[in-house]
UniProtKB/Swiss-Prot annotation:
A Pfam family: tRNA_synt_2f
UniProt protein name: Glycine--tRNA ligase beta subunit
Organism in which the protein naturally occurs: Ruegeria sp. (strain TM1040) (Silicibacter sp.)
Location in the cell: Cytoplasm
EC number: 6.1.1.14
GO cellular component: cytosol
Superkingdom to which the source organism belongs: Bacteria
Chief location category: cytoplasm
NCBIfam families: glyS
Signal peptide (UniProt feature, chain positions): none
PROSITE patterns: AA_TRNA_LIGASE_II_GLYAB (PS50861)
Assembly and binders: Tetramer of two alpha and two beta subunits.
Keywords per UniProt: Aminoacyl-tRNA synthetase, ATP-binding, Cytoplasm, Ligase, Nucleotide-binding, Protein biosynthesis
Length: 687
């Protein structure tokens, strides 16, 4: 057994590509080695800005010898057929074996492929991996043909056994493999040799390189939070930024700096976004006031002045960036507080195309405002406020701040609406109408915000359905699945009672409401599946009238799911399916529909009479419960049918020799189907 160490050392790899590149290196190497017959015990990939590292433990020293037996042509077959078989097998005639088979004597060839040394296989697999590496973007440099994300300087490829280490010989476009690497670009640039992974990791640490990105993340976060805590502040959590910054440095040195006082009155979100997007700084806030007061930057080296020069340079650049943000903020506020107010931005949206088949943003805003007014009574919102909020909700798209930082849309709308003196409900709707943006995003609950959020998403969906721009497979360029999930969460979280087909018709003339509703049902299945509700239970409820009322549909599905998990539910389902199958076969055979009601005077068996009584007693109760939307009570009525249905099938033969009795019993089965069908279409439930 041997351990393999690979390092591909290059110029700086973009942070966003490092994690994926490490996994690609691991997968391509291990897949290639296993395919060639080299199994292994474990493998892990590590990355820094300048290196991709792969360590494989417990690798076989040789691939195993493989024996393959091939059946050839019959003895006495045409010479050309035999020669073709020999060429394919790489053998001569005297190496073939004749064997008797039921079809006569046949030639057999035994081909033996000897095992190969691990180093030989590794060199082949690594060269193929490097030459065909799936970088999202790559480059060529110098006169070579190799493509890599940044110029590749060296390849470390080392096999380590108990008796020592050996370099796996390899040469790609002038880059030759070896046993050496280099430390930190500035603090320890000299190259040094290594003997294995442990030696490699230890020497890199001494050369100011932290190899593990998770270790770099932990070190950055610990130092940042400690420095902030010492000043009575706290770092704003941002896992995405933390991972990115860890991919920018090999030896993280955390520095905390101050923000000039003239910028402290900017909205905290503006400060945070500007520092993150332009400088990759963490924001440090005062937990009592919520104000951003300082920043954290991460340097890639230690300096004699403990980072003072680095910090001063960063503060200078940051001040220039924040001066721009302050200029945008003050200009936007001046407009918002003027006579024209935020409505003044709407005119320019008439020149902004939303989609070439759906018109401008201004036209879309008019549609959303009209729809929000229609939806308002359903969600308990004031219709005038909902319409007003919808008209100004996207006004900030014309502001300078949102032009610079598109991710602040909505949030800046709230600030500007407040500055313009608009009602707080309107200002809140400006921010919240985009929500929920994802499965973990909070759902708005203020009625005006809910009305505008629903109108915004439904306008998007009905519009793209009207022009036949629907999601296909994995492609969803307009995020319509996310919009549908947003509508579902808004409706369910706020217990909104509305028929979606009616809303679709009001939203956009020409939209296919039935097809769009089916799309919603598919998204609802995905949403409820994560909550433990089976897809067939949802299908059984979708088949019922009023399935475009999602709140009612989910209420029914949850009650049915609970019932189907009970013993009564499982047994009643079997009884229903048996009744439905017998009835369907009889109706097909007889060419009639047995739905005229059974007559008690033709009853012959006590179990039959008991089923009559149970159906009569529970049908009205189930119907009343369904009308009252008390699905738990309806399921209780269904549970009461379980015992008499079981007893009926235990004691009674439906297909009696007496045609009158048979017809009466089939009509009784029809009554079972009818009563159960009030709750859901149980024929769609599996089991």
């Amino acid at each position: 057994m041997a351990d393999l160490l690979i390092e591909l050392f290059s110029e700086e790899i973009p942070a966003r590509m490092q994690a994926r590149a490490g996994e690609d290196l691991k997968k391509r190497m291990t897949d290639g080695l296993v395919e060639a017959g080299l199994t292994y015990a474990g493998a892990h990939a590590l990355t820094t800005p300048r290196r991709l590292t792969l360590a494989i433990e417990g690798l076989l020293d040789h691939s195993p010898t493989v024996r393959e037996e091939r059946k050839g042509p019959k003895v006495g077959a045409p010479e050309k057929a035999i020669e073709g078989f020999l060429r394919g097998a790489g053998l001569t005639r005297d190496q073939l074996e004749e064997r008797d088979t039921p079809k006569g004597a046949v030639y057999f060839a035994t081909i033996e492929k000897p095992g190969r040394p691990a180093a030989e296989i590794i060199a082949e697999v690594l060269e193929d991996t490097i030459r065909n590496f799936p970088w999202p973007k790559s480059m060529r440099w110098g006169a070579g043909a190799l493509r890599w994300v940044r110029p590749l300087h060296s390849i470390l490829c080392l096999l380590t056994r108990e008796e020592g280490s050996e370099v796996v010989p390899l040469e790609i476009d002038g880059v030759t493999s070896g046993d050496s690497t280099a430390g930190h670009r500035f603090m320890a640039p000299a190259r040094f040799a290594v003997t294995g992974f442990e030696d490699y990791a230890a020497k890199l640490k001494r050369a100011f390189v932290v190899l593990d990105p998770k270790e770099r993340e932990a070190a950055i976060w610990q130092d940042a939070t400690n420095q902030a805590f010492a000043s009575g502040l706290e770092v704003v959590d941002d896992k995405g930024l933390l991972a990115e910054v860890a991919g920018l440095v090999e030896w993280p040195v955390v520095l905390m700096g101050s923000i000039d006082a003239e910028f402290l009155d900017l909205p905290p979100e503006v400060l945070q976004t500007s520092m993150k997007e332009h400088q990759k700084f963490f924001s440090v806030k005062n937990p009592k006031t919520g104000r951003i007061e300082k920043f954290i930057t991460v340097a890639n080296r230690e300096t004699a002045d403990n980072g003072a020069t680095i910090l001063a340079g960063n503060q200078k650049v940051l001040s220039a960036r924040l001066a721009d943000a302050k200029f945008f903020w003050e200009n936007d506020l001046r407009i918002a507080k003027s006579e024209v107010g935020v409505e003044g931005w709407l005119e320019s949206l008439g020149n902004v195309t939303f989609h070439n088949k759906l018109g401008t943003q201004a036209a879309r805003i008019d549609r959303i405002a009209a729809l929000a007014r229609e939806i308002a009574p359903v969600v308990g919102a004031d219709a005038d406020l909902a319409e007003q909020a919808a008209k100004v909700a996207k006004a900030d798209l014309s502001s300078e701040m949102v032009y610079e930082f598109p991710e602040l849309q909505g949030l800046m709308g709230r600030y500007y609406a407040q500055a313009a003196g608009l009602p707080q409900e309107v200002a809140n709707a400006c921010e919240l109408h985009y929500s929920p943006l994802g499965p973990s995003d909070d759902v708005p609950t203020e009625p005006v915000s809910v009305a505008v959020a629903l109108a915004d998403k439904i306008d998007t969906l009905t519009g793209f359905w009207a022009i036949d721009e629907k999601p296909t497979g994995s492609k969803d360029p307009y995020a319509l699945r996310r919009a549908a999930l947003g509508v579902i969460r808004l409706v369910l979280s706020n217990d909104v009672r509305v028929g979606l087909k009616e809303v679709f018709a009001k939203a956009y003339e020409g939209a296919d409401g039935s097809d769009l509703l089916s799309f919603f049902h598919d998204r609802l299945k995905v949403f409820l599946r994560d909550q433990g509700i089976r897809h067939d239970v949802i299908d059984a409820c979708i088949a019922m009238e009023g399935s475009d009322d999602l709140t009612l549909l989910v209420k029914r599905a949850r009650a049915l799911e609970d019932f189907m998990k009970s013993e009564d539910g499982e047994n009643l389902l079997q009884g229903f399916k048996r009744a439905n199958n017998i009835l369907s076969q009889a109706e097909e055979k007889d060419g009639v529909e047995y739905s005229f009601g059974a007559d008690k005077k033709f009853v012959e068996d006590p179990a039959e009479a008991a089923l009559f009584e149970a159906l009569a007693a529970n049908e009205a109760a189930i119907s009343t419960a369904i009308e009252a939307e008390d699905f738990a009570a309806a399921m209780g009525g269904m549970a009461a049918l379980r015992a008499p249905v079981d007893a009926f099938f235990e004691a009674v033969q439906v297909n009696s020799d007496n045609p009158v009795v048979r017809r009466n019993r089939l009509n009784l089965l029809s009554q079972i189907r009818k009563v159960c069908g009030q709750v859901a279409d149980l024929s769609r439930i599996e089991g």
